[in-house]
Amino acid sequence: MKSFGFLSFGHYAPAGRRGPSGRDALHQAIELSVAADELGVNGAYFRVHHFANQAAAPMPLLAAVAARTRRIEVGTGVIDLRYENPLHLAEEAAALDQIADGRVALGMSRGAPEIAQRGWEAFGYRAEDPRGADLARANFERFLAAIEGAPMAQAAPLGEQYPTSCAPGTPLRILPHSEGLRQRIWWGSGTTASAQRAARDGVNLMSSTLVLETGQGSFADLQAAQIAAYRRAWKEAGHSWTPRVSVSRSVFPLMSERDRRLYGLAASGDQVGELDQSPTTFGRAYAADPDTLVRQLQQDAAVASADTLLLTIPNQLGVDANLSIIENFARCIAPELGWVPSTRGPQEHDPLLL
């Protein structure tokens, strides 16, 4: 692990209920990101959910964070592509990349089970697959083509153009265009097959907080096997650059009596169940003193395999509580795992060792 950041689910209270409002959650996300940037934390990432009291429109938030910070990477974990116009998303992603000077890590995927029944249809999109997998895949392919500069339209006849700027029939690409943006796109994967496809697509891997598979070994072992399969597929595809891999974990350093009171019962083991009609293994949560956490995370095969760790945080507890979690991890645990703070400059990721 060379880099770590926080992953916020952006929870807020329904209208009329106690707790942070939607406005509070957005402003607190910006404030926490600024504080994390000052600590040298490498990334601020946000999950996206629709029809729920959670973060739903990431681009304005990411742009605000990027404008207020100097080093921290801003990203998503993940954007649900069933809800997206891929060309509009390409425009927004390129503009964000330029605002952030390349400090972007946009995770995307088919999305998770949600509160709405085929909610993407309310946004004007249709899918053959009841879970929308075909829609997400088509949107991802078109998005990747758009950010690479592939023509998406052609210039109108001269009498129909305003202003007149192109010869009729000239191929037109999506603008703005941000060079190298594809290397900052990630696919959120829960299966070995989707991890291998991400490698063939030439995008980074964001391994989920669960795996849609069961088998021998722990959640961490299953996830590490997916990462290994991704890296083998990447090597076979012959891409010319080294990708990144992230995993997400809930980690609560117990530094005080208050920490033990708030998070002491958060520790849990792996769980096996069913999600989205698939056998699923859910990862454990870590809550212990720093020495124990270091030992446990060093033994986590997926954390050891990844270069980036995303700490899932209870954002509804507010800035101070979450900054304490992040700061304690940065001070007492991350250095023992190989962390390189952003204050030391851009990360150079090791070539694949396969």
Where are these regions (language model features)?
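Flexible, glycine-rich active-site loops centered on histidine and acidic residues
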Residues: 2-22, 83-154, 213
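Hydrophobic faces of well-ordered beta-strands that scaffold small-molecule active sites
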Residues: 4-8, 44-46, 74-77, 104-108, ...
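Conserved, mostly hydrophobic/aromatic
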Residues: 4, 40, 48, 65, ...
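Alpha-helix-loop-beta-strand connector modules within alpha/beta enzyme cores
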Residues: 55-79, 327-341
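Active-site mouth loops of central-metabolism enzymes
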Residues: 12-27, 79-86, 179-189, 280-291
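Glycine-rich, proline-tolerant flexible connector loops at the mouths of alpha/beta enzymes
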Residues: 43-65, 80, 209-220, 310-323
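N-terminal beta1-alpha1-beta2 module of alpha/beta enzyme domains
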Residues: 1-72, 348-353
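An alpha-helical appendage that flanks or caps ligand/catalytic pockets
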Residues: 129-174, 207-208, 215-307, 340-353
